[in-house]
Amino acid sequence: MRSSKSPFKRKSHSRETSHDENTSFFHKRTISGSSAHHSRNVSQGAVPSSAPPVSGGNYSHKRNVSRASNSSQTSNFLAEQYERDRKAIINCCFSRPDHKTGEPPNNYITHVRIIEDSKFPSSRPPPDSKLENKKKRLLILSAKPNNAKLIQIHKARENSDGSFQIGRTWQLTELVRVEKDLEISEGFILTMSKKYYWETNSAKERTVFIKSLITLYIQTFEGHVPELVNWDLSLFYLDERSYQRAVITNRPGSVSPIKSPTSNFTTNTTQSVGSVPFSAPTERTRRSETESVNPVSTPASVEYHAGMKSLNKAPYSSNSTLNEVNKRYELEQQQQQEEAELRRLEEQKRLQLQKENEMKRLEEERRIKQEERKRQMELEHQRQLEEEERKRQMELEAKKQMELKRQRQFEEEQRLKKERELLEIQRKQREQETAERLKKEEQEALAKKEEEEKSKRNKVDNESYTQEINGKVDNLLEDLNAVLAEETETTPTMQNGTYVPERSTARAHDQLKKPLNIAKVESLGGSDLNDSISLSDEIAGLNTSNLSGEDQDEKNDLSFEKGDEVRYSNNFEGEAPHVYHEVSIIQEEAPAVSQKLILPEENNESEALIESKEEIKTMENIDDEVLLEILTDINWSIEDDADSMIERIDLRLAETEYLFNQNLLSLQKIGPNIRPYEDKVNDECHRIIPTLSLFLMEMSNFSNDIENVESQDNGLQVESANKKLLWNTLDELLKTVSLDEISLNQLLECPIREKNLPWMENQLNLLLKAFQAIGSDGNEVEYNLREISGLKQRLQFYEKVTKIFLNRIVEEMQKKFSNIRGQDISHDQMIRILTTLLIFSPLILFCKEISQKSYQAIVENWNVSIQPVYMELWTKKISQLQGIDTNDEKMNELSLSQLLNEWDTFRKERKTNDINPVFKNSFSLLTECLQTMRQECIVYQNFVEVFFHISSKHNFEEYIKHFNDPDAPPILLDTVKVMQSDREAAVIETQLVSRIFQPIVTRLSSYFVELVKAEPTVAPALTFYLENEIKSLESSNHEFLLSAVTRMYTQIKQVWSDNVEEQVLHFERISNATTNGEILPGILDLPVGLKNSEDLFQFAKRSMDIKDTDEGYESIELMNSSFRKLSIAATRSITHKEVNSSINPNLSDTAALNNDYMETISLLVNSNWLTEMLSMLNFNKDGIFDTSLQNVKKVFDVEKESYASFLLRDTMPKLTAFVYGVSNIIENTNNVNMTNPSRWAAYSRQNLENILLAYTSHEIETLVKRLHTHMVNDFGYHQENAINNVLCDKLWSCIQGQTVSLYLKLYTVIDKHYRGTNIRFTKNDIISAFEEYKNA
């Protein structure tokens, strides 16, 4: 039993209409206040028995609270939604002219949101209809811009991005009927060529929209209205009389909403009175047709005509006519009584159904209340959890505030303590100065004497200290100066950058020799690399205090606080004037690194200048390939103007923004998962704070020791325990910064070859270490040896050597790159060349670490050199592909022949075999090209990553150690790597690959698009192949290749969809075409194309070794939907002919049969072709062609019967006319007053005997032969023999069946009304005659 609730809204609150509205069948005037659902405080006795019970509570509104606020909120929500939809609809559908015709857009009038059921589009869906069948749509009313009287009704949908798109459109003139659903308060039916059942979101929206629609109809058609069924006419300001005057009922397909028994009786009576066997005009028409076929006039025809004239003069002169009238009158009375009884039964069923619906509504409301209570409990629980979370956050925030407050108090106490200590120091200084001023005059003489004695004592100490230093074997300064000034040709041994010092007890101050001259190095201006450092000058300031007395007093008085270690480290490091002072206090702890300060103003100015330069450079260097790629992404065409291109770009930007917003929304779901980790981090920070405080306290204990060491005059007098560590450190540093000049000279002259690379890498590693040890302007190191005068010149020498070597590397690599360009290479040779170049990757890393300018020059030279190589390589490849001719006539003939052979095998064995597709070679070349592109992109990106060290984390020393390790795995360039976590490196790699392969991919995509346009059967297999490639590259590091394949897949899919739409439009255009019994080209090519596409798809599936394709492949769904759409469009074109055809299989109109004879033959040939081919294609395809097969079989069955009837009429005109005429008379009379047709002049016994004289057994054979000849002439030369034989067998069986049926009807008529009449042939004669030609 159907429920009264809408199947579209199962889980929403029921808003039922009034009882009076539900119980009304036609136009009843109701008062809104009389609704039984809204009655309050009414006793049960006052309610009629037919109304639902009221006592006990209102079923629709059981709560006693006022709903005025809810109604207001609902109205406001509907108004806001209506306004939003109106603006969006105007913006999307009525703001731009038609891009095809150029016509201005329509003027928007109004709209309403509706819900339709795809399974029940013309009737109310059952309550158990599935939710996936429900589609949200909109009905929009608009007017033509040039004629406000031309109103259109549009059905639109809302896209996922919020835009609207118009689908089907009707003219307002097509609106015939508007019916109101009495059971569903939101449902209504519009009849526009056929019925459409829709539901609005609320009853109020339905009322407002229908009222606007009818008002607009009245204004447009000058007061006329369509048929209004079950509506309150007062809603449209009409009454019954004005409605009868305004309604339009003379249109085809219209049905009056109010049935009149009187009019029915009059119509039936008229028909009964006028139901004479033949009227005069009809007889004249038929007689003229008979005479055209057989011009010889028989006496029977004359008598028949005379009889008709007498009948027209006195229609009631015969008793049989009066009896027939009386009999029909009694039948009409009996029919009226039966209709009254049926109406009473229907009323009882309706009342019972209403009671059952009321019970179901009560159960539904009870269930809704339970769900509402459960939802309220869940919301309350969630609110409590949120409240607890908020309290916990407030407690944590309070703890943080207390901690900050305690820290500020501690800092304030430290500041006050520091100020008190400073005041105390100043007071003591003032007292001391006063005392010293009083005793100054008395102590002047004593002070002078003490100063003289002190100076003498210091001089003696310095001399003894100098002798002590010169006498020590492990004197540090002596060895340091010896290393920097020693001759390279004598006693010191230097080999490969290593130094071995020689100790001596006496140092001779010989004149130092100058370094060797190097041809490749510019003159250093006559200055020696190893100038001697005067020992006496260096020692003169060793014992001088570095800090003044005031600084010492200030540092001794200050306490150690948080952040003081940075201040102290800066002071100590900045105030050390002596070059050896920093070396003398080397400790095991690493000192703080000095930081460079940059003013904010200068930084902002420099950044602004850089940004302006980059903008100018970007505007000047617009890449045409990038611009072409953007246009290709939006699927532009040559016919597009600037507005259409901007519209396409806006759509693509909207899609990108939507995806970006979706990703942002998905981040909100991750937020709560991060909260526990944040709490853990805060807890760990609270645990570290006490440890840090303890560390600061311990650090303050060492501050005094540090200040004591810094304040000593003899800072180089370190403990003997640190001397060995200091010596080892200095020894290592000096060995690092001292390189063999001969080796450097050889480095500049050594050719860059594979055999020389290990030695060159060793020398470059030593040179790089020297740079790092000495320190350069751009590097921040723990120590800086650039201040040593002996190392300044050596550093300049190293820098010049490095500069020359870098220029040499750039030149040599440019030559190697140019050699690649001059070669005629293949794809495999290109991969081997890239693998060979990897041996020079350490040199590229050296350039990257030393000079970014040289590194960028090498990268740019590589891009400039390699791009023409790949472009030339792929130009040849694409030229070879363009030689494929997929649209050759031989290929089409081969496809048709292969299809017929496969059909013949399927008809005999009922199975299909895997065969080689026609376009196998072409598709193999395409996939081979795509596979080559995939391999080369992967190899090139891996090469760029390794050769240019884009994502490498190793320094030069680590890299050459790993690179030269024989146990290390080899570098494989054709390996697909996982997605890289370093996004900056990934972007750089993508840019380098895109610069080379972007033009190639663009040309290749254009070729594929043109190929698919020329031969669309390749598209399904190609999209399937590309989608499989996308799935394999989704989690890989090759982002450019993934984007290129995705873009290519999107373009081919779009071209395939456009081709399908064009074919559908083609089938719609040929729906009225008629051929001379031949198959339409589109109908003939459709199974060929579908078979080729299916075979090529299966071949691609087998070649890629894919077993399971049930899930995740969009291309398969696209292919199935396209096949289904094409087959339905083809069958609809034939169905449209059949619907519009006037052929009547009962042979009542010979002229119509003659006029549509050729169309019947065309329909038979086309429908038979589609039936046979679609049956084969539907095998193992999950029934995607079931609907098309059913439609085309219906067409074939109807046309088959029509064709057989036509042949019988043409071959045996007299006999068929007589038999079917008598049969019609017998069928149209009742059993009470049986009419004897033999009494009629046209159907007399004598007339029948004269007709049967011409039909003997021999004549039957002649007639059957004539039938066969006629059929062979119609279908003998329009198709191959196999299809022709199948079609002829079907038609021959149908003709035999109708001939036998004609004989049986003749035998029945003779047995009832013409007994004694002799038939000179038998049924066996007919069957044997047909069997003779069945296998011919």
Curated annotation (Swiss-Prot):
Which keywords, in A-to-Z order, does the entry hold?
Answer: Coiled coil, Exocytosis, Phosphoprotein, Protein transport, Transport
Biological process according to GO:
endoplasmic reticulum inheritance; exocyst assembly; exocyst localization; exocytosis; Golgi to plasma membrane transport; protein transport; vesicle docking involved in exocytosis
Q: Does the keyword Protein transport apply?
A: yes
Entry GO CC: cellular bud neck; cellular bud tip; cytoplasm; exocyst; incipient cellular bud site; mating projection tip; plasma membrane; prospore membrane
- Entry-annotated residues carrying Phosphothreonine: T290
Q: Which residues form a coiled coil?
A: 319-464, 1309-1336
Q: Which InterPro entries does the entry link to?
A: Sec3-PIP2_bind (IPR028258), Sec3_C (IPR048628), Sec3_CC (IPR019160)
Pfam family membership, one: Sec3-PIP2_bind
The residue ranges flagged as biased composition, category Polar residues, are: 31-47, 252-274, 291-300
Which residue intervals make up region (Disordered)? 1-74, 252-300, 429-467
Question: Which residue stretches does the UniProt record annotate as biased composition, category Basic and acidic residues?
Answer: 429-462
**Stated role:** Component of the exocyst complex involved in the docking of exocytic vesicles with fusion sites on the plasma membrane.
Q: What is this protein called?
A: Exocyst complex component SEC3
Q: Which organism is it from?
A: Saccharomyces cerevisiae (strain ATCC 204508 / S288c)
